[in-house]
Amino acid sequence: MSAEFDERVMTVPLRDVLAESKGQRADKAMSLVRSHLAQHFNVEEDAVRLDPSINEAVWERGRSKPPSELRVRAARFEEEGEAVVEAETA
């Protein structure tokens, strides 16, 4: 880890998944979490690592009823010269 360590607790809005069909809402919610974190931490989506607790929170009520928002604790740091974001539920 380097000196550049940025940790934030943020709320990820997931209301946009309601536009998806019921069978794809939880899948879309997971990709929305990843893209939201990538945008706010200025990294590519491939550099975002999601903890299984996020997956469990999204899928808790099934595929068709993900939460409308999700509190996430995310940290950005440098690993092997590249920026990486790790996230878990807050």
Curated annotation (Swiss-Prot):
Q: Where is the signal peptide?
A: none
Task: Spell out the Pfam families in the cross-references.
Answer: Ribosomal_L31e
Q: Which PROSITE patterns match?
A: RIBOSOMAL_L31E
Report keywords, A-Z. Ribonucleoprotein, Ribosomal protein
Task: Tell me the domain of life.
Answer: Archaea
- The answer to whether keyword Repressor applies is no
Q: Name one process (GO BP) from the record.
A: cytoplasmic translation
Q: Which HAMAP family match?
A: Ribosomal_eL31
Q: What is this protein called?
A: Large ribosomal subunit protein eL31
State the encoding gene. rpl31e
